[in-house]
C-alpha cells in the first residue's frame, strides 16, 4: 500500500511537502500498514557544521528510547518512522557544547491533526558553539566565583553575552557563532591582573587563549573604643609567603615607633583606620597573613586587642573578625573666620557653659584636663556668629575640629533727599537680604529712625533691596541702586548705601518733508492724571524734545498726526535707574485703507509716472492699512489667483476712502505627465448646471511650446538678418548664413491646463489619449475659494507595457504564467512558440508582475540579469529495489531521499520497488528505515546527472521480532489505552519496549531481540484506571519468529468514596438538624444535604474518589433567640474508600425551663419488659415499639407543661429536678439494657430514639458486666 508520495523540484525554490504516512490498526499483519506516521525535518545552520555528529532521538513521555537516527550529511534532513500513536518527545543530541533551538519537541501523535500527520517540518536550528575558560587567583590553580565575564566581538565595545564564574573560577558562553572574540572580566572590588583574553571560534567548541587572573581580594575590618569608632589606628600586615610586589593599594613605608616582636614575619605594608573605625587592604593575593594593630596618641601608645591576628585569603573578599578594641589628655583647637581661613583673635570659647578661654592672635586655644566624654563648645565675637558644637572628645582627638564662623554682619544706610509731594514722609523702611546661592533664602529687617540697618548672613553671594511702599513707588520714589549686590566671605560688610534717583527723557522727530506743527506728549502709565506735553514747530525735517525731572516709572510718549504713517506712533519707556534718551519718531508715508475678500498682491502706478510701478504690496484678507510713500492719484491693479469685479481701481491720497475688492472666480491648475509625447485631451465637467463642459486640447506639452517659441525666435532673427542684408547690399550677401538649432524633445512631457472656478464648485477632470493609460483615469476637485486652489490635478500617463522572453535552449509549449505581484490568481497564461519565445502585452506599467514557467519533465530557472528569460533542464530519476535476505520483495520499508531543498519519504509496496522521478541534477542522500530490520547499505550519498536514471538495490536483514496480544476485562470487553511493556530479563535486562492498546484492545510490542526472555506486563505509569492484571505478567522467550496470543485480563479501579457519620445529641433536636456537604473551595453552596429525621446516623450518596478537599457542616433550625449552640464541622480529603465522622451538638436554653419527671411513667414498663424479655421476646418487640411511642408522647407533654409554667417556678425547681430525673432514668435504662438478651443492632435502633438513650448508650454497654 502506497502511503506517501514524493514530488520532483520544479525549481530550486520549490520544496515538496513532507510525506504523511497514515495508517491503520495493530494486528498480526506485517506490512506497511503498521506505520502510523513519519516525523521529519531539518537540522539547520547558517554556518558550516558536521551534520554526521548529530543524532535525533525519539522518547516516550516516560523517557524510554523508541528510535534514533542520524542526519543527512549534505543538508541535515532526518526522518523517524512511528508505529504507535501517543505522546512522544523528540530530542536533538549534538556534541557537548553545541546549541540548538529548540532542544526538544513534544509530540501528540493522533494520526489526524498533529504536525507529523499534517506533513509539517520539525526543524532544529543551530545557534552556536560553546566557549570555555577560567578566572584564576594569582599563583593558584583555582579561582573565585562571582566574577563578571563578558564576550564581545574583537574591535567592538558592544557586549554579546555576560556570565559569572562558578566556584573554582570556571565560566562558559553558549550559542557563539564562528568568529574572533574578546573576553573581558570585571569585578567591583577585586583587582584584576589579566582582565582580558581572546578566543577564535571556527567549526567546534573553543577555549579561551589564556586564563584571566585576579591579582587580589579586598580585606577589611574595624576598630572601636568604648563602642565608638576609632580613627588613625595603624594596621601592619605581615606574611611569610607573599611579597610586597603582590600587594596593591597599601602603604609600604615603615611605621615610626613600631618594634616587631616576631622576626620570622616579613613586613609588607600598613593601612590606617578611617573616621568610621574601618580599615581595609585593597588587594591581597590568596595566602596566609598576620595583621598587628599599632596606635600611638600625641604622647602615649595605646594597647589594642587582639594584639595579633592571623587570617587566610582564599578566593573571595574577607571581613576580619573580631573587631579590634583600643583599651586604655589637654586638647587644642582653633577659631577661624572660614574654612581654611584666618584665625579669629579675642574670641571667647565656652566649654559646657562653664570653662571660658580666649583665643590667641592666630585664633588658637587650649583646653586642659579633659577626660573622655561629650562636650558642648561655643565661640563668641562681635559681628561674627558661630554655631554651638557638640563633640565627642577621646584620646584619638588631641586636636579638636576647627570652630568656623557661620555668619557675619551686613550693615548699611538709606539716604532720601526729598519725598514726593503726594505721600507722607516715613521714618522706617523694610530692607530685604536675599541669597543668590541655591537656597534663595530671604531675611527682612527694619531700619532705625536714621535709616541704618544690619543683617546676619552666612558666607555667600547676596543682594540687598529696600522695600519701598507701593504708594511711594507710584509717586516716583526710587532708590539707587535698586539692588545692592555683595559677597560675604570671611568678614563683616559695613558699607551698604542707597540714595534717591530722578531722571530726564529726550528724543527727536524725523519727517519726510517739512514737519510744521507737532505735539509730543509724555503720560505716566502708573500714575493717573500725570501728563506733560511739548508743542514742536519748525520748517525743518527734524526736531528734538526733552522732558526734565522725571520720576521713575513707566511712561507712554506719543506724537499726534493721524493722516501720516509713522514708524512708531507711540513708544513706551520705563525710567528705572538711568536717564532715557534716543527716543525717535519717524514719518514713513501717507495712510491708505482697503478691504479684501482674499489675500492678494496689489500693484500701484502713480499718474505722471507712466507705467512705472511705484509699489507692490502683499495683503491679507480683511481690512489692510498701508502707506504710500508719495501723495497723488494711484492706479491699483490686483495680481492673484483670483478674479475680481474690476480689472483695476483708482485711489487719490487727497480724498481718502476705503477700497473694497471682492473675488468672483479662482484659478485651478492641472498637469498631465507622460513618458511619451502623444495626443492628450482634457474634459472638465462642472457641478454647476449653468457651466457647460469644457474640452481642452489636444494639448501641447511644455516641451513643444518651448520648441515653438525657439523656432519663432529663430525665424524672427532670420527675417531681421534678411532685412539688414537687403539694406547692406552685395557686401552682406557674401557672408554665409548663420545656422541655429532648436532643443531636442526629451521626456517626460508635461501638459499644463487651467480653469477659472467659482467658490464651492466641484469639477471632474478626465484625460483621454489613443495610446496612453492614465493614473488615475479621472480626478475630482472641490474649489472652496478660501485660498488659491493651486495645482489640484496631477495625472500621469504611461504607455502600455509588453513582457517578452525566451527559453534557452529553444523549447516549445512551455507554460508562461503572468501574475500581478501579490495576487492569488494568474493574470495571463500563454505558451512559448516553436522558437521558445513569447510576448504578453500591453499591461499597466505601474504594476509589478511575476513571470513563472513550467513544463512536465523539466526544471526551468530564471536567467540571471534578465526579466522573463529561462533556462530549461531535463529532470533525472532514481529507482530503488528493496529485498529481504531471502531475495523476496520487502514491503513497508520507509525510504527517505533528500538533496538540496528536495526531500521525499515513500513506503515500498508489495513489489519492494520505489521510483523517484523529476529530480534535478545534484547530490542526494537516501536512508531506508523499518523497525526490526537493518539494511545494506544503511545510507548513502549518490550523484544524479541531468537526464540520468539510476537503479539501486537495497537488502534488508531481520534483527528483531514482535509480540502480539490483547487486553480485555473479565467479561471479555476490549480495554483501549492500556500501556503495555516488554521488560528484558537476565542478560537482556537493559532492553525494553512499550506500546498502548488500540480500540480493540490489541497491542504489538516491536523490536524484541532473539534469544531474550521478556516479561509482558502493564506499565507502572499511565494505567491509573487499572487496579490489577491477571496474570501480573506473561513470560515470553523470543526465537526467530513473532509471538502471538499473549492475552491479559485487567480489573478497573473502583472510583467510589463512601461517606457516613453520626450525631451525638438529644433526640428532641434531631428534627431540627441537617448535615451539609461542601467542597472546600466553595463554602457558599452545598453539593449535598441530608436530614436526620429521627435517626442519629446519616449516609451521603457515593462521592468520586478524586482526592479533593471537602467540609461536612451540621446545621440547625433551632432559634438563636432561645438557644445557644455551636455548629460543628469536619474537613476531610476523598482518599481511600470510606470515611465515618462524628458530630456533637449540645445546645443550651437561654432561660432554664422546668421538666416534668418522667421516671414514674417508664419504671413499670421497663420492669415488665425485663421480666418477660427472656420468655416472650417474640411478642415483646411490638410492645416495645408501642412503649417507645408513648414515652415520646409523655416527653412532649412534659415539655408543654414546662412551657406553661411560670418563669419563677422554673428558676427555683429546674436544676434540682433535672438532676434527680437524669440519675434515675440512667439507672433504669442500664438495668433494662443489660437484661435484654437481644441487645444488638435492633436494640440500638429501638433505644436510640428515646430522649435519654443517645447520651448513655455507649456508657451502659461498658457497665453491663456488673449485672
Curated annotation (Swiss-Prot):
Keyword terms, alphabetized: Endoplasmic reticulum, Glycoprotein, Membrane, Signal, Transmembrane, Transmembrane helix
Entries under InterPro entries matching the protein: Carb-bd-like_fold, CarboxyPept-like_regulatory, Ig-like_fold, NOMO-like_N, NOMO1-3_2nd, NOMO1-like_9th, NOMO_12th, NOMO_3rd
Location of the protein in the cell: Endoplasmic reticulum membrane
UniProt topology in membrane: Single-pass type I membrane protein
Biological process according to GO: multi-pass transmembrane protein insertion into ER membrane
Lumenal side: 32-1155
Glycosylation sites: 50, 218, 618
Membrane spanning stretches: 1156-1176
Name of the protein this chain belongs to: BOS complex subunit NOMO2
Naturally occurring in which organism (per UniProt): Homo sapiens
Gene for this chain: NOMO2
